[in-house]
Curated annotation (Swiss-Prot):
One of its GO terms (biological process) is translation. Belongs to the eukaryotic ribosomal protein eS1 family. SMART domains: Ribosomal_S3Ae (SM01397). GO terms for molecular function: structural constituent of ribosome. GO terms for cellular component: ribonucleoprotein complex; ribosome. It comes from the Archaea. InterPro entries: Ribosomal_eS1, Ribosomal_eS1_arc. This is Small ribosomal subunit protein eS1. NCBIfam families: PRK04057.1 (NF003142). Transmembrane segments: none annotated.
Amino acid sequence: MSERSVSKQKQEKRWYTVMAPEIFDRAELGETPADEPEQVYDRTVQTTLGELQNDPSENNTKLTFQISDVGSDTAYTDFVQHELTRDYLRSLTRRGTSKVDAFVTVLTTDDYRVQVQPVAYTTKSADRSQEQAIRSTMVDLVEESAADNTFADLIDSIVEGRLSSAIYNEAKTIYPLRRVEIQKTRLQASPEEVAAEEEASVDVDD
């Protein structure tokens, strides 16, 4: 390929400004290049909550978005995942204490299926029954939150720390806690995907 052809390709490449979803105030996530708009779809973009909010104290929260729509020079994303950094989670671990985690798959009021992973850290070592009670409380509160909220509101309550605070206030009555976090949240299926799965399940049953 000649230098002229390569130069022409570079000139034709367009840059798209990538925007966060509405629940993150359509914040600008950066730019991505492509020859055609179709190439931009499904690309993922990672950032931190600290970068979105211009708050370095929130850099331990990683966010992943996926491009779902493309305009003339703008790419719009959907939320895919929220995750705390390994270094931050490791810093919460103390010798002689207990770490209690759970994996909860829930359906929001607008039919998004989400996996939520809460984790609690005790002040001292808890026994097995206390750990089970804490885990049960975490699961119950995550399920209640999903049953009462849309996908956007659930994600907002997780990212802003309201859900972890609610779990902390409830679970600390079982055993003294030092910290509760939602260590990871992942979108598993959109309403369209959930509906398709349910339809396929009905067909199999028939």
